[in-house]
Curated annotation (Swiss-Prot):
Residue ranges the record marks as coiled coil: none
GO cellular component: nucleus; tRNA-splicing ligase complex
Location of the active site: H430
Organism of provenance: Plasmodium yoelii yoelii
Keyword Aminoacyl-tRNA synthetase listed: no
Protein name, per record: RNA-splicing ligase RtcB homolog
InterPro entries from the UniProt entry: RtcB (IPR001233), RtcB-like_sf (IPR036025), RtcB_euk (IPR027513)
Subunit comment: Catalytic component of the tRNA-splicing ligase complex.
Record-level GO BP terms: tRNA splicing, via endonucleolytic cleavage and ligation
Length: 507
């Protein structure tokens, strides 16, 4: 693992371009860069990047790598095309930074797939459900709704779901994704139509999921988990693009929505762990030398690469079922409080997006269509109007992009653009991105102050683990509005509407 001796050695490779909010990470920052890095940050967010670099320089004995170095490291991987891309919410992660997009040429036999480019929580993502309710309808029931959602949706580390699976059921679920949810009565048919990939990965094969991974997943279907995962009752706070919002069923301020942020739980984590161990063992066979062992990888078309792709697809299906199951539970909770059916309450899924995934997609490179394996880690697909993979309902506005904020802050719905297709492989940000480590958050923030701040904003909170109050406080994250505005100003996504939370459920 390479280490720079002086701060200026890093900074001199970072160059501001003529394009708004775009910095270039030039070749030479680390040995063996195949392509440059492109980093989308405004001046305020750039200061956080600079602080990460300075911290790295001061602590020479640490194994910590700042996001800029990680972006450059990814550019050394075999088969990468165009650039290693950092989005405004970028921060240091495992191997790849969180907020990194990297695409690899499927026609290059040396091009690789890397579990670090997806993350441990495979298909961590966000779902947004609208209702025909407005804030006046729920303000006297806010605490009741918060408690009922907390009671209905299993939360926290090790939480167990209400869907009891046996081995055969789980194998079917891992293969079918949301088609399984529809078959079992947990989803409406329309739900999957407004879900990325219709809620089913065609790469999935449960035979490539280890017994240990299945054992971890079998009890966790329909569970929120912990960390930054949440279910929130939100209200529409601002509408920027009335036409796009209307296509999503949003016409007025104060309309009530539910946002669910969760992933593939222990099953996905185990699949990632299994793949990293396997790939570390065999890299020498393929003559792959990585600059950081956390970038363990194998050729896409190798047996190990294909095995991971199939297991990852199964984890994606599990995550879509997981969010579908919690949608079912949220619909039950609202139905119980308002004594109306979910259909009468217009509880339709607006969209469901992933922000930890690798997928084979077609993109134009140097004027030619190429099949690429696009790794998105802490980044969201952002396909434009009239793209064939955008649902029929959204052909005129582009794919909805769901950007979750932090506990007590705004969330956003954006739409995809042609410029994203040209510059970022059809990708944009995924959220706020951490600014403080979990440990620093626990040590520097006060439990009572964070709760008091939420109370002042009239936000109901239910949390299974009190330490999460500090870890997930708004002060622990970058300003999500800055992140979203940077993407909007850069043209890689457009703002449609903004939401603010009135009730937060966390693990």
């Amino acid at each position: 693992m390479m280490k720079h001796g002086k701060g200026e050695d890093v900074f001199k490779y970072i160059e501001k371009t003529n394009e708004k909010n775009l910095y270039r990470i030039n070749k030479g920052l680390v040995p063996g860069m195949n392509v440059e890095g492109n980093m989308y940050v405004n001046e305020k967010l750039k200061l956080l990047i600079d602080e990460e670099i300075k911290m790295y320089q001061l602590n020479k004995s640490s194994t910590f790598l700042p996001a800029v170095i990680q972006i450059a490291n990814v550019s050394t991987l075999p088969g990468i095309v165009k650039a290693s891309i950092a989005l405004p919410d970028v921060h240091a992660g495992y191997g790849f930074s969180i907020g990194n997009v990297a695409a690899f040429d499927m026609n290059n036999e040396k091009a690789v797939i890397s579990p670090g480019g997806v993350g441990f929580d495979i298909n961590c993502g966000v779902r947004l459900i609208r209702t025909n309710l407005f804030y006046n309808d729920i303000k006297d029931k806010q605490e009741e709704l918060a408690q009922l959602l907390f009671n209905h949706i299993p939360v926290g580390v090790g939480s167990q779901g209400f869907i009891l699976c046996n081995q055969n059921n789980l194998d079917d679920a891992l293969s079918l994704g949301m088609d399984w949810s529809v078959k079992e009565g947990y989803s409406w048919i329309e739900d999957k139509l407004n879900c990325e990939d219709n809620g089913r990965s065609l790469y999935a094969n449960s035979d490539y999921v280890s017994v240990r991974a299945k054992k971890r997943g079998i009890t966790q279907m329909g569970t929120l988990g912990a960390g930054n995962h949440y279910a929130e009752i939100q209200i529409v706070d601002e509408i920027y693009d009335k036409k796009s919002a209307k296509l999503m069923g949003i016409e007025k301020k104060n309309q009530v929505c539910i946002m669910i942020h969760s992933g593939s739980r222990g099953l996905g984590h185990q699949i990632a762990t299994d793949a990293l161990i396997e790939m570390e063992k065999v890299m020498s066979k393929y003559k792959i030398n990585v600059i950081d062992k956390q970038l363990a990888c194998t050729p896409i078309h190798s047996p190990e690469g294909q095995n991971y792709l199939k297991a990852m697809g199964a984890a994606c299906n599990f995550a879509w079922i997981n969010r579908s199951s919690m949608t079912f539970l949220a619909r039950q909770a609202f139905s119980k409080v308002f004594n109306q059916s979910p259909d009468d309450l217009d509880m339709h899924v607006i969209y469901d997006v992933s922000h930890n995934i690798a997928k084979i997609e077609e993109h134009f490179i140097n004027g030619k269509v190429q099949n690429l394996l696009v790794h998105r880690k802490g980044s969201t697909r952002a396909f434009p109007p009239f793209h064939p993979l955008v649902p029929l309902d959204y052909q005129y506005c582009g794919q909805p992009i769901l950007i979750g904020g932090t506990m007590g802050t705004y969330s956003y719905v954006l739409t995809g653009t042609e410029k994203a297709m040209e510059n970022t492989f059809g990708s944009t940000c995924h959220g706020a991105g951490r600014a403080l480590s979990r440990n620093k958050s626990r040590n520097s923030l006060s439990y009572s102050d964070v709760l008091s701040n939420l109370k002042e904003k009239n936000i109901s909170i239910r949390v299974a683990s009190p330490k999460l109050i500090m870890e997930e406080a708004p002060e622990s994250y970058k300003n999500v509005s800055e992140v979203v505005q940077t993407c909007h100003d850069s043209g890689i996504s457009n703002k449609a509407f903004r939401l603010r939370p009135v009730a937060v459920i966390k693990g």
